[in-house]
């Protein structure tokens, strides 16, 4: 009996399983965090060659299990390979270290005023779950993990918002990360690079105008995604989506911020220390606070560390009952929270607890 193997059982792995189940195909799954029916130990190389197809999730680290020679001798399929083959929409690929989700969200809103589009991919909507959608445009948000494993890009148009060091714990160094990001250019399509002097919203209108007729009837009032420079109450900003130093420093500069900056998260993917200018006070909290103290430098700001957010907000409130606060963690969630949404919602709840009238 022919069988396929799924490597990794996160969001993409589950979508592979659903896809194969609907097609009534036999499969096994390897994920070191799961056990149960259909789950197996990682097969020896000689057995891997016997699978009909091997489907690989974006974050799966093959080098932990196989040599370079073994990896190069096997054929792996991504969910994007399947999507490119079986979905007939016009495919717009979007990548970048920061801003790709916001750009994709703006573009979707604009295109849906004059045509029809849907965001899939790293945005949280696995492409296989939308394999047969009937929209004209697929706006595919692509991470470096997805692009690194992609066999062949069949995008119709590519967009890069920016590239700065990120995920170096996975890619090893900035050059590997950059190389993965730039794989979005290896296609038949034109690639657009965002202009640093243009807002992402204006950039989205520019791209939409290259695809559809955008006129005065097209609303320029677009919704924003949560956890991106989101005002919780006047003077307090939730920027929990900030998962690297580049996004943290961008937020400070954009807001010309000089109040209380709050940082947290796991700094392992940051290649080196960085200087924070502007904020009068910097707070670092959480289980990674000692490591963060090694990375975050500030000659102009006082830096305080606390074990949890409650203690941070209590300290701020002692000095000012209506403070300016920027919560821009600058790191992945690590051991403190499940993800940036979880920590952003936690922050907003705590702000309302301490500072709402």
Name these PLM-found stretches.
Residues 36-46, 51, 70-76, 89-90, ...:
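Active-site regions of enzymes building and remodeling cell-envelope glycoconjugates
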Residues 1-93, 228, 294, 300, ...:
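Short, basic phosphate-binding NTP loop
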Residues 28-31, 193-195, 262-264, 279-289:
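Short internal beta-strands
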Residues 20, 54, 94, 122, ...:
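Residue-level signal for inorganic ion chemistry
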């Amino acid at each position: 009996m022919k069988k396929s193997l799924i490597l990794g059982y996160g969001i993409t792995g589950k979508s592979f399983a659903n896809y194969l189940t609907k097609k009534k195909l036999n499969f096994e799954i390897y994920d070191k965090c799961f056990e149960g029916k259909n789950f197996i130990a990682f097969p020896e190389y000689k057995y891997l060659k016997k699978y009909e197809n091997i489907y690989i999730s974006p974050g799966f680290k093959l080098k932990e299990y196989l040599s370079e020679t073994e990896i190069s001798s096997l054929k792996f399929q991504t969910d994007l390979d399947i999507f490119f083959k079986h979905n007939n929409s016009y495919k717009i690929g979007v990548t970048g270290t920061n801003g790709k989700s916001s750009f994709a969200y703006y573009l979707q809103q604009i295109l849906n005023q004059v045509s029809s589009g849907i965001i899939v991919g790293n945005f949280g909507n696995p492409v296989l779950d939308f394999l047969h959608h009937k929209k004209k445009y697929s706006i595919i948000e692509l991470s470096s993990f997805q692009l690194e494993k992609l066999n062949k890009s069949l995008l119709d148009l590519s967009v890069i918002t920016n590239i700065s060091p990120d995920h170096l714990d996975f890619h090893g160094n900035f050059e590997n990360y950059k190389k993965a990001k730039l794989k979005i250019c290896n296609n038949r399509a034109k690639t657009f690079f965002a202009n640093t002097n243009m807002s992402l919203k204006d950039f989205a209108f520019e791209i939409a105008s290259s695809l559809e007729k955008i006129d005065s009837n097209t609303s320029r009032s677009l919704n924003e995604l949560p956890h991106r420079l989101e005002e919780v109450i006047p003077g307090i900003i939730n920027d929990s989506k900030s998962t690297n130093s580049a996004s943290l420093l961008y937020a400070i500069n954009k807001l010309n911020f000089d109040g209380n900056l709050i940082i947290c998260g796991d700094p392992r993917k940051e290649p080196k220390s960085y200087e924070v200018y502007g904020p009068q006070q910097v707070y670092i909290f959480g289980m990674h606070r000692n490591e963060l103290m090694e990375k975050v430098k500030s000659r102009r700001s006082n830096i305080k560390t606390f074990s949890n957010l409650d203690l941070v907000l209590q300290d701020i409130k002692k000095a000012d009952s209506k403070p300016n606060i920027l919560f821009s963690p600058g790191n992945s969630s690590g051991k403190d929270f499940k993800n940036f949404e979880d920590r952003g919602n936690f922050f907003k709840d705590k702000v309302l607890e301490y500072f709402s009238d």
